[in-house]
């Protein structure tokens, strides 16, 4: 089953490649104009197990599983402050990025999910929302800071590293 899903995901990547590249290029251009060059955008593809679970839950085939990928927007508040000379909190930057997206693209009604102020159990923090791209496809966007990603991935190791580094300075 998972080998078939891997092959289907690869085919889907090829099929959506041009539209996604155009969307990412446009988003990069918009965010660089509004915030600066330190914001990174990439595409994250869901794992076969995650897609299989959706297929089972929704009783559908691969073609009918929505959002096989999402657009990840990562930012570093310190780099943004150095670039712009203006301090903004992580929440302020995430909300500013959200505002930029929904002012340029039509937001899917009811798609906004705030994990930034109410993190998941694993301390995952981000803003999730969906917009209609200019190529006619709804794209799911996840906005988070580099620190939020590290905390969700490495947990207490990040916090203890920061405490250790603060003792050294």
Would you name each region that the model predicts?
Residues 1-169:
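Nucleic-acid processing machinery
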